[in-house]
C-alpha cells in the first residue's frame, strides 16, 4: 500500500482514494519566463507519483493549471513591447518543450486562468453571499478572521502574520483591507491593463482564487491529492483551502504533498545571487535530460535538493551506466547476437528459470516497497542499479571478446533482467538516450552558451563568463572574442 507524507496532518498516511479515479491537482507555472531548476524538481517528483499510481493499477486524472494573468506577465509584456496573451502563449510553448525533454507526462488537462473568469466570478460571489468576502473600491477581499480554521495547513497564527507574507500585494491593496492578513479575490482594473467584466466592475482575479475555481471546475469540490512546492504552503495553499472550504463546506483535498526547494552550492537559488539556472540553459550546456531527471530522483522529494557541479557530474556518470544497460539489445544486434527474441529451439533449465524469475520478482517487490514508502526514489534507484549491473558487465565483456558465446540460460537471464529494467525505469520516467561517443556539443548549444556569456559580460559577471568559456573548452570549443558584441568559435 502507498504511504505519503500529508502536510495537512504532518504524518505519513496510507493513501486511500475517494473513488475509482484518483483526482490530482498540481499548481502550475506563472507563464512569464522560462522554467528553472525548481520547476524541474517539482514536476519530475509529481510525474513519478503519477506514474507510480498508474503502475499500481490506479486510474488517474491529473490537472495542472497555467496562471496566464499576473503582474509579472504584465511587466514582461511591457518590457518586450508585447501583450499579456503573447507573453503567456510564448512561455506556454517553451514550458511544453522543457517538460517534454525531461520526459514528464503531459497533464490530462491544463486549464488557463483567463478561460475560467466566469467560474472565478461565480466562486467569489458565493464567498460574498456567505459573508466571507467584502468589497472595497472595486476590489474584493477575503476576510481571514471569518474563518476559524484559517492556518491549519501552515500552522500560521493569524495575529502573528506579517502583512508581506500574503504574497503578490501592493501598498494600495493593503490600505484598503479591513485587516492586513486579508487577501484579494478580485482586483479593480488599472488603466491600460487587460481586464474582465465582473459583478464588481472591470478587473482581474487574485492569484489564489484562480486555483480554487479551477480545481472545482476540473475535478470537483473534494479531490484526492493537491501538489506543489513547499514555498506554496503559505500563503497560496492556505488561502486555497480557506476559499474552497468556505464556499463548498467540504474538504478541498485529502492529501497535500509538497516538494523541497532547490539550493545551489548550499545557497537558495535566486536571480539576485546570480545562481539562477533555467532548464533550457542546463540542457543547452550539454547536460542530458535524463541526467537531470536522474539527479532529481537521488534525493527524497520532500528534502532540499542541493545543485552542485560535483553532484550533477556524479549523476551523469551513474546515469551513463544505466543508459548503457538499457542499450543492451542495440549493442548486441550490431554484432548479430540475438538476445531479444526467445528462439523456438532455446532450452532453459527449469530450475535456473525459476531461480531467475524469483530473483527478479524480489527486486520488483523491493522497488515497489521503496516507492510505497513516500516515494523513496533513492531506494528505487538502488534496485535499478542492481538490475543494470549484470547487463553492463555483459556488455563490457561482449565488446572486449570477439565472437563471445553465451548459453541459453545466460540469454534468458539477460533478457528477463533487461525487460524488468525497462519496466521499472519507465516507472521512474528514465528513457534510453543515444550513447554519445565523444564530448561534442552541437552548434545550437554552442551559440546558446555564447549568447549567455555575452549577457554575463554585459552584466559585468565575468566569473560566469569565464565559467562558460571553460565549459566550452572542455567540450572542445575555443571562443574568439572579435569585439565586445561579437564572439566566434572553432572546434579544437
Curated annotation (Swiss-Prot):
Disulfide bridge partners, by residue number: none
Intracellular or extracellular location(s): Cytoplasm
GO biological process terms on file: cysteinyl-tRNA aminoacylation
Residue ranges annotated as motif 'KMSKS' region: 268-272
Catalytically driven reaction(s): tRNA(Cys) + L-cysteine + ATP = L-cysteinyl-tRNA(Cys) + AMP + diphosphate
Co-factor remark: Binds 1 zinc ion per subunit.
Record-linked Gene3D superfamilies: Cysteine-tRNA ligase, C-terminal anti-codon recognition domain, HUPs
Binding site for ATP: 271
Binding locations of Zn(2+): 27, 211, 236, 240
Main location: cytoplasm
GO cellular component: cytosol
Record-given protein name: Cysteine--tRNA ligase
Species: Prochlorococcus marinus subsp. pastoris (strain CCMP1986 / NIES-2087 / MED4)
Upper lineage: Bacteria, Bacillati, Cyanobacteriota, Cyanophyceae, Synechococcales
Primary gene name: cysS
Amino acid at each position: 500500500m502507498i504511504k505519503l507524507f500529508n502536510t495537512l496532518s504532518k504524518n505519513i498516511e496510507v493513501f486511500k482514494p475517494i473513488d475509482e479515479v484518483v483526482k490530482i491537482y498540481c499548481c502550475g507555472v506563472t507563464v512569464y519566463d522560462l522554467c528553472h531548476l525548481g520547476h524541474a524538481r517539482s514536476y519530475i517528483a509529481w510525474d513519478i507519483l503519477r506514474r507510480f499510481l498508474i503502475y499500481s493499477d490506479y486510474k488517474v486524472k491529473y490537472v495542472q493549471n497555467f496562471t496566464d494573468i499576473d503582474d509579472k506577465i504584465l511587466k514582461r509584456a511591457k518590457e518586450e513591447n508585447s501583450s499579456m496573451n503573447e507573453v503567456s502563449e510564448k512561455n506556454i510553448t517553451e514550458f511544453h518543450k522543457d517538460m517534454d525533454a525531461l520526459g514528464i507526462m503531459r497533464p490530462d488537462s491544463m486549464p488557463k486562468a483567463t478561460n475560467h473568469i466566469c467560474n472565478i466570478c461565480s466562486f467569489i460571489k458565493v464567498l460574498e453571499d456567505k459573508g466571507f468576502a467584502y468589497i472595497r473600491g472595486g476590489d474584493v477581499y477575503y476576510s481571514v478572521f471569518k474563518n476559524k480554521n484559517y492556518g491549519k495547513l501552515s500552522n500560521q497564527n493569524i495575529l502573528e502574520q506579517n502583512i508581506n507574507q500574503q504574497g503578490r500585494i501592493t501598498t494600495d491593496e493593503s490600505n484598503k483591507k479591513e485587516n492586513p492578513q486579508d487577501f484579494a479575490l478580485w482586483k479593480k482594473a488599472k488603466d491600460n491593463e487587460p481586464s474582465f467584466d465582473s459583478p464588481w466592475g472591470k478587473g482581474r482575479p487574485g492569484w489564489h482564487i484562480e486555483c480554487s475555481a479551477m480545481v472545482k471546475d476540473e475535478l470537483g469540490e473534494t479531490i484526492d491529492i493537491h501538489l506543489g512546492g513547499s514555498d506554496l504552503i503559505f500563503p497560496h495553499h492556505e488561502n486555497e483551502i480557506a476559499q474552497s472550504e468556505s464556499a463548498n463546506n467540504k474538504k478541498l483535498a485529502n492529501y497535500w504533498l509538497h516538494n523541497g526547494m532547490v539550493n545551489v552550492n548550499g545557497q537558495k537559488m535566486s536571480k539576485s545571487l546570480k545562481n539562477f539556472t533555467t532548464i533550457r540553459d542546463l540542457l543547452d550546456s550539454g547536460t542530458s535530460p535524463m541526467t537531470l531527471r536522474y539527479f532529481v530522483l537521488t534525493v527524497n522529494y520532500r528534502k532540499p535538493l542541493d545543485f552542485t557541479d560535483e553532484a550533477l557530474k556524479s549523476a551523469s556518470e551513474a546515469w551513463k551506466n544505466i543508459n548503457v544497460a538499457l542499450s543492451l539489445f542495440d549493442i548486441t544486434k550490431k554484432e548479430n547476437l540475438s538476445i531479444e527474441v526467445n528462439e523456438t529451439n532455446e532450452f532453459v533449465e527449469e530450475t535456473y528459470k525459476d531461480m531467475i524469475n524469483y530473483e527478479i520478482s524480489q527486486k520488483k517487490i523491493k522497488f515497489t516497497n521503496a516507492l510505497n514508502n513516500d516515494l523513496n526514489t533513492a531506494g528505487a534507484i538502488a534496485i535499478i542499479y542492481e538490475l543494470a549491473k549484470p547487463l553492463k558487465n555483459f556488455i563490457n565483456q561482449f565488446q572486449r571478446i570477439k565472437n563471445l558465446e553465451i548459453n541459453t540460460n545466460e540469454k534468458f537471464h539477460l533478457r528477463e533482467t533487461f525487460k524488468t529494467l525497462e519496466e521499472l525505469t519507465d516507472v521512474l520516467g528514465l528513457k534510453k538516450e543515444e550513447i554519445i561517443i565523444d564530448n561534442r556539443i552541437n552548434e545550437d548549444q554552442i551559440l546558446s552558451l555564447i549568447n549567455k556569456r555575452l549577457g554575463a559580460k554585459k552584466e559585468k559577471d565575468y566569473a560566469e563568463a569565464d565559467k562558460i568559456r571553460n565549459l566550452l573548452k572542455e567540450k572542445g570549443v575555443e571562443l574568439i572574442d572579435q569585439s565586445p558584441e561579437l564572439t566566434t568559435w572553432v572546434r579544437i
